[in-house]
Amino acid sequence: ITDYYALKSISYPAEFFDSERVIPMIAENNSIKVLADGNLEVNGVASTKLTVGLRRLAARVDVVLKSKVDFGDASSSEFEGITFSNIPDRVPLVYGLPSDCLPSSWAYADPVLPYGGTAITRNVERKLTLADNADCFKIDPTLLTTEDKNNDLVWAVKVKKVILPSSFFSSKSDETNAINFTVNLIDKYSPSCKLKILSDPDYTLPANAKLDLTGIIREPLEV
């Protein structure tokens, strides 16, 4: 790296982002001056320390699925697992900037540097199954509220701490870039949807976000 703007060509492959690895992070502190006595001047104020707020380049998604159909327990379930697809194959380092969220908000402003590295392809699939990823799943009827039961929901499962590469694109309402979410059922139609975080809609998946996804399976079809 020869200068600040060389950062815009750096990216991390999608395989760097999962719950078993240290997630790539970035932080940026501006207007820093190193004083002669070894202290710092931060935004014109003398200080003995520099606080660095790291922003993860991934998003965490916790999933809760509820159904009107009893799919059974972990040993005999018709529920196979879940799949996230249309995931970007890399995450640019600059998509983690700014590293501080907006005042009084969980949200961040759009990236401040344009990405100029290897082109991003949305061809990555992340599949989690009861058979191969049992620790991620918890079939638990206590997840159902009284209101859920009154609405004839009888089965629920939680999928915890799914780590996905963040996904940014300037046209946030472009659903062709959205991450697809599929509920995989055995010998039945597997329903799917496109993930969006706001009703605007916004199909991006922000860096450093923690999102809760609740899905209702009403009437799966046999195939």
Which role does the model predict for each range below?
Residues 54-60:
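Active-site-adjacent structural elements in enzyme catalytic domains
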Residues 48-50:
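Short strand-edge motifs at loop-to-beta-strand transitions and within beta-strands
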